Amino acid sequence: MQGAQTSEDNLGSQSQPGPCGYIYFYPLATYPLREVATLGTGYAGHRCLTVPLLCGITVEPGFSINVKALHRRPDPNCGLLRATSYHRDIYVFHNAHMVPPIFEGPGLEALCGETREVFGYDAYSALPRESSKPGDFFPEGLDPSAYLGAVAITEAFKERLYSGNLVAIPSLKQEVAVGQSASVRVPLYDKEVFPEGVPQLRQFYNSDLSRCMHEALYTGLAQALRVRRVGKLVELLEKQSLQDQAKVAKVAPLKEFPASTISHPDSGALMIVDSAACELAVSYAPAMLEASHETPASLNYDSWPLFADCEGPEARVAALHRYNASLAPHVSTQIFATNSVLYVSGVSKSTGQGKESLFNSFYMTHGLGTLQEGTWDPCRRPCFSGWGGPDVTGTNGPGNYAVEHLVYAASFSPNLLARYAYYLQFCQGQKSSLTPVPETGSYVAGAAASPMCSLCEGRAPAVCLNTLFFRLRDRFPPVMSTQRRDPYVISGASGSYNETDFLGNFLNFIDKEDDGQRPDDEPRYTYWQLNQNLLERLSRLGIDAEGKLEKEPHGPRDFVKMFKDVDAAVDAEVVQFMNSMAKNNITYKDLVKSCYHVMQYSCNPFAQPACPIFTQLFYRSLLTILQDISLPICMCYENDNPGLGQSPPEWLKGHYQTLCTNFRSLAIDKGVLTAKEAKVVHGEPTCDLPDLDAALQGRVYGRRLPVRMSKVLMLCPRNIKIKNRVVFTGENAALQNSFIKSTTRRENYIINGPYMKFLNTYHKTLFPDTKLSSLYLWHNFSRRRSVPVPSGASAEEYSDLALFVDGGSRAHEESNVIDVVPGNLVTYAKQRLNNAILKACGQTQFYISLIQGLVPRTQSVPARDYPHVLGTRAVESAAAYAEATSSLTATTVVCAATDCLSQVCKARPVVTLPVTINKYTGVNGNNQIFQAGNLGYFMGRGVDRNLLQAPGAGLRKQAGGSSMRKKFVFATPTLGLTVKRRTQAATTYEIENIRAGLEAIISQKQEEDCVFDVVCNLVDAMGEACASLTRDDAEYLLGRFSVLADSVLETLATIASSGIEWTAEAARDFLEGVWGGPGAAQDNFISVAEPVSTASQASAGLLLGGGGQGSGGRRKRRLATVLPGLEV
């Protein structure tokens, strides 16, 4: 881990002193309540809700998320500051009922309370005092009925807010502009700031707010730690924060263990390791969350590009709904996936011998069945009797998922449950072929409208949670109790550094710099540069980064030329790249075997999407990963210090301090979680602060107070790294069958080849008269060798097209090890590029592993199967339902698979992915434990239709399954939605594009006289300006090929004297009439034998396609000839 930084380097030292939080008051008359509702967690009858902290909607622009909070005064003349960041969400508690609910289904609060009880989690117990009255915290002159009240609280002091130990000081009010509303904020200080004490009536407490925190925040933490006494957990967290007890074991007495742990042959060690992992997560996770964080651009709500074209509040709310729809697949995946992080149920230990590494013998398990089993306390006494649930025993297999399991996933919080239900409304149902069910309309008008419904009693069947559950019932996962070691699915924001091109981090040189900066005369040609250069070449051909063409092909000649131009650009880049590797003596054949796709999961809470659900998922993901990476450390320490019959709390009393102290150096920066340790200082011995004692009495004075930091070291998390090996190197026979490439030639080589999607896209352009589909036409050609020719078209052109497609497809099938059918020209070019590199590296036997992105696409569909569009209106019959929904539409979301994830990763996506953390030791006697976060697989058939196993694509027959060599990641780009796209610092002049285009033409046509094409390109770009070109102009435009300037000027002069129109078509026709086309001059060549000495050959090295070498005696070698001959 990186050493402590100086005070000038970290955000904590740069933050300013301030309070522990603020109470914000927004005027109801001007505040955008519907936008807040779309961002929040309101439900029918809510008294408090959570909303993301965003500049411009909940806090003022320029709000600092990092602060040095004044939280204590040991004596009247000294203050203690603590560096912390704000909590990701704010809590709306005053007049919260004025915010519309995000989900209108009734009965959520009662359902959550009942389900919490049957799962054994304790409910919120209010303090034995009344909630603070508005007069205690409202500034003078404000009417409490005209304002909405919300609390923004810091991470380090949210437990103090929960327990009513903060003091609001209305006399220190500040007027701030939040969006279009003139709002007011009042600071909150800890009661320890007042040495003489504060009357309890002056301490701010709101039972509805604390209940919301108990349900929406702390119950989720308790679930991640597998403890059921939530209130006691909050007390321990407050004590740890207040008294700095991070190295003291706290939660072990609260732990509960299922029967599988109690009955395990090594149950004593398993209980100790489980408890120790939870203790480490409790010690380190709060420290990481309250550390200072970078302020991302997405925090500025008032500058979201999402609202760029919105006129009026209705359009803004509609834009927010569309944005929320794009996030729905991430939320639904966590509900529908069997291995969701929400269903992680405990720690298991393998009993097998030899197969599992010792460090992987302890692992995290998941299973809804385990979560509802009976449990025992650390002293092996029964403490929770369990819950049977509906068919949980699974008489005919796994148990059935029930509404109660959905409530469990939402942490028994009606606020979170409403938000989950809102996202699930965007999802499409998948009807099982085995269980025929009634139509949605029949259900809504029948069972849902019955008074027997426990939630809505038949009054609001269209929006009832039971109706939503019925519509999606076949997508929910089975209820099982598993002890397998499977990945778990995490969700959050992607980091800024991802390497997801086909070859991942191949030749990135990041970890190989031993002596700092390299000399300028030895530049590194990295794989990243290669991809950037390729994109630049394609842009010169009129192809943008997404594969879109500036000029579409209009016939077979244009179609063939389009691909030949792309092929030439790719081949030129590959030759240059391979030459560079050979020149620098890079052992690329070995390096390609160890390359990975790399993805980063950001640990910045404010980089997460603006949604309380993602705050919950981020907390759960971080706590689970911390426990996972701590398991081998706890196991080794328990092996060295066996429990010998001690209970986990007893064992931890004697060993936890040492274990906690060593965890930082043993687990951080060891392959998965990266963090930095920062030293926080305050530059001045004193600071200007209000006189809080006087302010409490209503008098506002300033004073200069001596201060010091109460906590100096801060652990700032950065990223969690997830990898995926590109080249298969394993020995497992089953896996090998999935990756091995068949040597038999396939009959359908064209429809599985690189051109098929383009042939389908331009089918009507190429064959305007045919009624045959493109699939049948080209499949038929591969068997019968015939293509139709439209009337009036050139048979030669279509013959050339067919031969080009046939030859290119055959060559592609022979060399291809990237199992995708490219859908755009960028993917086509990258596939050709990487196939050439892999062939040069000798990797032709196995397909490589791929990461495909599942990118959401919103769509508007008829509302027949989406009853929630009707709202709370009553439904009398199925016919009335059909009539009511016939004219309505519903917004739904589906995911489309992308062939290459790299372009999506550049757009700062929100990602949902499965991860497995493997542990291993170093090499050459290094006994340190390292971790590797490996990309895994989703479990559950209802996650997404793209993940369902298909028997084949088109007419393709494949022996090995492709699922093992294709990993999937849900990815929602945020660039252009919540983050502005970067504008180019410098604009490109037109003359630069002309020059680059001419150089590209000459570079690609070194074997033939290219003056003809250069002149036509010049005329097309400059028109009549060509007549006035000087020699200096021509030499500049031709760049390093300026020797052609005279020939180009002579040809332009010939065109000018002819008097023809200055267009590319007219110039081409004229020159073809004069010269007979490019290369038509019939010169008489003789063969000249040129002796070359062996010594000169050895010194010259490998020459690949040099420029300006004269006539055909030294033609540029073909790529297929060059690459196999490369030797390092």
From Swiss-Prot:
Listed InterPro entries: DBP_sf, Viral_ssDBP_head, Viral_ssDNA-bd
SUPFAM superfamilies tied to this protein: Viral ssDNA binding protein (SSF118208)
Superkingdom to which the source organism belongs: Viruses
Compartment(s) where it occurs, according to its Swiss-Prot or TrEMBL record: Virion tegument; Host nucleus
A Pfam family hit: Viral_DNA_bp
Record bears the keyword DNA-binding: yes
Residue ranges, annotated region (Required for nuclear localization): 1104-1128
Primary site of residence: virion
GO cellular component: host cell nucleus; viral tegument
Nucleotide-binding is among the record's keywords: no
Molecular function per GO: single-stranded DNA binding
Alphabetized Gene3D superfamilies for the sequence: Viral ssDNA binding protein, head domain (1.20.190.40)
Keywords for the protein's UniProt record, in alphabetical order: DNA replication, DNA-binding, Host nucleus, Virion, Virion tegument
Example GO BP: DNA replication
Quaternary organization: Homooligomers. Forms double-helical filaments necessary for the formation of replication compartments within the host nucleus. Interacts with the origin-binding protein. Interacts with the helicase primase complex; this interaction stimulates primer synthesis activity of the helicase-primase complex. Interacts with the DNA polymerase. Interacts with the alkaline exonuclease; this interaction increases its nuclease processivity.
Function statement: Plays several crucial roles in viral infection. Participates in the opening of the viral DNA origin to initiate replication by interacting with the origin-binding protein. May disrupt loops, hairpins and other secondary structures present on ssDNA to reduce and eliminate pausing of viral DNA polymerase at specific sites during elongation. Promotes viral DNA recombination by performing strand-transfer, characterized by the ability to transfer a DNA strand from a linear duplex to a complementary single-stranded DNA circle. Can also catalyze the renaturation of complementary single strands.
Family classification: Belongs to the herpesviridae major DNA-binding protein family.
Protein name as catalogued: Major DNA-binding protein
Species annotation: Epstein-Barr virus (strain B95-8)
